[in-house]
Amino acid sequence: MTKYVYTFGGKTAEGKADMKNLLGGKGANLAEMCLLGLPVPAGLTITTECCTAYYANNCQLPAGLMDDVWKAMKNVENIMGMKYDDPENPLLVSCRSGARSSMPGMMDTVLNIGLSSKTIPGLIKKTGNPRFVYDSYRRLVMMYADVVMEKSEGIEPADGKGIRKQLDDMLDEFKAKRGYKSDTEITADELKQLAEDFKKKVKEVLGTEFPDDAKAQMEGGIKAVFKSWNGKKAVSYRKIEGIPDDWGTAVNVQAMVFGNMGDTSATGVAFTRNPATGDNHFYGEWLINAQGEDVVAGIRTPSPLNDETKNEQNKNFHSMEELMPETYKELCDIRRTLEQNYHDMLDIEFTIQEGVLYMLQCRVGKRTGVAALNMAFDMLNEKLIDEQEVVMRISPAQLDELLHPILDAEDEKKYEVIAKGLPAGPGGAVGVIALTSEKAKFYAEQGIKNILVREETNPEDVEGMRAADGILTARGGMTSHAALVARGWGKCCIVGCDAVKIDFEKGFVYINGNVFKEGDLLALNGTKGYVYDKEIKMINATENPLFQRFMTMVDKFRTMGVRTNADNPDDALRAVSFGAEGIGLFRIEHMFYGKNSEKPLEKLRNMILSDSTDERIAALDELEPDIREYAKATLKVLDGKPLTFRLMDPPLHEFAPQGEEKMKEVAKRLKISYEEVKKRVDALHEVNPMMGLRGVRLGIIYPEITRVQFRALFSATAELMKEGHNPKLEIMVPLTINVKELEHQKNIATEIKAEVEAKYGVTISYMFGTMIEIPRATLVADKIAEVAEFFSFGTNDLTQMTFGFSRDDVNAIVKDYVDQKIIPADPFNTLDQEGVGQLVKLGVDRGRSTRANLKCGVCGEHGGDPDSVEFFYHAGLNYVSCSPFRVPVARLAAAQAAIKESRKK
């Protein structure tokens, strides 16, 4: 029989840290802390496998599960010295989620389970603190009604206002009538009455009585946590983070300890190092006489843990170090123990119950890219990790974040700071105000940069937070939901900016006397916590010496090459500065677009609209010097690094004049009638041009087009050689389907090369290869490799041809397919490893069966996608090629793939 329940507590546990796939991150780490001898309230973990079984069984708990839970609860009761559902000495528990990958705030939690009319009197008698008991009870009613009775049952509030919001409004109204500013001012009798009023409201709104049976509460809590795995916010977060839907969540049932028992009790969240900067200081926040949700939800601005955590908002609050020095020292000792054990920065939650410290959670903490880099090198110096682990510690997304723009410091100096908050997320952002998650998504879809402005964010805002360019909240600390999520995404974010007041009904934002409406502009400096009302210039982040050191370290472990897709000398230079080892895709057709393209485009159109081979050759002869100089400039910049030149690929109609005015200009230049030009342009039209006369087919039907390109390329190479340079030319024939096409083009190359060598008196060395873009080419790759010296997989077209998807028309279809889980991801962003990936592997294997030293690369956009890069590494490719700004990410992904492989040996 499958074991679904694992116990922990009393310095023993059935699990450990490396069991997070089964126990979830929270359950595995609770077990590990017990094994380390740390003070952890006892509990039990229901496995992720049980969650999978729950969904497979039509949302029914597996037979016998609750019997196993009650057996495990005996162990909890023995360790804690209390008994669940006991009228004299009641044990209360929490039900919390715990996926294998951290999903902060995305799933549900219920605290204080076990309070009922049967257990309340006994707890009052035991604690002598009726206020604490009724405060805990009203919290249970609020959470349970929200999580178990409404969300878990799939009840959608008619007016959009859920039961939790209605109960929160009742609480705010209650305090306002009495002039109370804080929950802690409410008396025991008032809390008792509030709880009763809450239960009446729950019955009125949800049509069901709040359960007064402790065992029913427990089962309801467990089911609700499992159901929250498929809640809207959890599904959205998983989609953003790429977390598989079939992982499931564990459920942790843990004995409650209370931070709301008075002034010797508290709750807090801390990081063993600063998650925004990486500084090696204990960093955290705490609240006296509160429960953990108060800190994480950002409902109250918390106090600092120590002097290092003090800021403008909390500098006058007493730190834990000041008020509870002995407990703080104990927490510092735990910090050291955890870092020595995990060799990483940890995010921890703790509760102090009447002076006694308990650890409720530890997990590897989310951090900004800058913090990740600083921590990794600090831990290397501290001998906690080695160089290999430094490379593994920085995710491709964090590396990408380090290249993100920031506010221009010189421009920033010109403007007045209108408000200051806590710098929770890095970099800068400039955009219009969005007051709701929906508005942020709307702006993003329109391509409008925006700042999501909220009182505080909650997990329901996750899609808007992702869509926004920056986040600004009025409340909350550095450990609030907004701060945690923003840091994880490298999103510019300022929290706890108490100068911000929002009137949602009128759609106004008030900041220190300034009035703004939705759509007005703000600028954020997320590194300093500054808010501006002016459009400030954005610049690329200043080069960090640590970044350069890190990339050097990355290249020590990388075995696969990284090139760039570039079409001009400027792009080539930029890519080389990012570490590109050459150009894997140089597209000649880009010389006919944009800057300085008018004259070359005129000549190309003369060729396209020619009426005979002689006319076409004459037009191409005029074009040859332009192609030669265009290629020569980039070959010169690369000097010694390879340039892979793709012969002209697009269908000719793309370059034809469009519209009557343009056609008349061409007619005048060619001295023919407008009608004749229109007739020739119309003749170029194809029903399906992407599968028509393009690529190698152009060079076979019109060999003069191939000749002019070869002559230009060989001449550029010869001239550079004579000037003392070291050009490394690779010529790539696109869209081949068999070896005969390549033989045809290679014969032309051999003929032209001999002519150019004779003219310049040099011997030209170059490589001749092909782009593998059509599925048939992978099947006959062994034959193609008889002529081709290298393959470059054009995965954009290979994906298009394999799926039968048109890249230009399929966006909506792909989105629906991903949403309905018909395919796991957009195959144009992340390589389809089951289909397209297998064709790549087949092409590599068959090609090398003929030519053992066949060089293989990829030049589609997948070359910059980390997951795809790892696949290409295992497929045996020599290099990937991607856009210039993706080069550092591809270098890191290639190094991490090599390290993972080495660790398997």
Briefly describe each language-model feature range.
Residues 504-510:
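Internal gly/pro-rich beta-alpha loop/helix module
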Residues 44, 474-476, 495-498, 586, ...:
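Short beta->alpha connector loops at strand-helix junctions that form conserved
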